[in-house]
Amino acid sequence: MGRRDMLSGETVIGRDRLIRHRTWENFGFGCTYAWLMTMLFGGDVGRIAGFDQMVLSIGFLLAGIGAGAVFSYASKTNVRVAGPIRSVPPVFVGALGSLMTVLIFVPLEGLALFVVLPIACVLSGCCYMLLVLRGNEVWAHARAERAMLNVSMGSLFAMLLCILSIVMPPIVSAALSSVLLLLGSVILNMTHVGRQQVRRHGEPSSMERRLLFKILAFVASFSFALGSLSALASLDASPGFHIALIAGPLAMSACIVAMTARFSPPTAFRRIHQLGNPVISIGCFLTLAVTSVFGFGCSLMLGGIVACDLFMWFVNAEIVARTKRPAEEVLARSCMIEAMAALAGYATVAVLGPLLGADDGTSFVTALALICGILSVVVGSFVFTSHDARRLIESHQMAERSFVLADACAAISDACGLSPREQEVMTLLAEGRDSPYIQSTLVIAQNTAKTHMRNVYRKTGVSNKQELIAFTHEKLARMKDEAVRPSDV
């Protein structure tokens, strides 16, 4: 039985994993993402435990997130290590992360500040990363439209929660932040997984590997700016500044939700990629040129960074869907680069800024953070260029057309009793290929190719290639008309 995708109207048929999307499942990613944003930009640790503890906690949190990503990536091929970790229920991971988050808000002094705080931050960061990877590993097997809508709606929900926590009394806000990982893990544990065909191409070519390297450089560039901006935010513990800071990501997330719901995945890909770097550039310019709109400029910078971050998740979901690489490998690799670059950006501003800033440390830190933002725009613009993004989008479009045709051919093959080799020949014929092309592609003799072609025509009840093409498209149209919408309950 097929189904019609709620956004594209295309039919998805298959036997592997399918997310039967229910709206409240977006809140799983939203809760975990909200935890990260509140810990980096909420300022609650500073208002409760003091400025010094907040500065240290952010650095240790980023280190813990990076450690979780490194561990996940390193253990992807080690079954003895990865197996026990993957068998741990998400709720247990979320409960441990929430417990460690409570310790972060407890005012600490002396030796405890350098023993208890690092342990709590690193463990909570690792728990966050394990939950994010587990959740996005599940969602990466959904179609691009569904994965994009889930991540963007989760981001919007996260920003709303972050603003809510800022306006709350510090103790109440800390309590909310402490339970976010647990809530996210409970929702993740309840996410329903069905069956769907995982659409995959072969291993990436050398050109695709170069593109993957450029994507990782792009991830490192905006993540470095994210870390530097979080260090800048730690200088001001006032709720007003943090609300203004989160307003940009909130507006950006709402915009991306609208685009993913309104446009096809290739169009949404292109528009989201076009948003990130220009918005960061405008934010840097306003912050440097107009002192009175400093908070607004920082808000735009963070909004652009969030757009780049969401684009990174969409690209990862696309890579997982189109290659044979495991989801945990692709996602952990990007998260590892993201966390390490963010930690480097944070350390650059938080450590070098006061050391080199002399009498005017705050102004120097601000300038250094803006320089990091400008560098991210330069790297993002000249390493992962608009040409690379367009090539990725065009390959997505070609893959989607090929996948849809392959679905129809697979259904016809099952109905008409074609052999696997005959199905391959029929798919090439439905694409309009001739006999020499089929011989070269499948590495078969001329007589063998002609025999398979005759068998395909005979079993499907057509007399030539044009009739087969028409028959395939008619079958595809019927599949779409007969598709069943997924349940929303």
Protein language model regions, located:
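C-terminal ends and interior cores of transmembrane alpha-helices
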Residues: 92-110, 277-292
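Glycine-rich segments within core transmembrane alpha-helices of 12-TM secondary carriers
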Residues: 144-169, 333-348
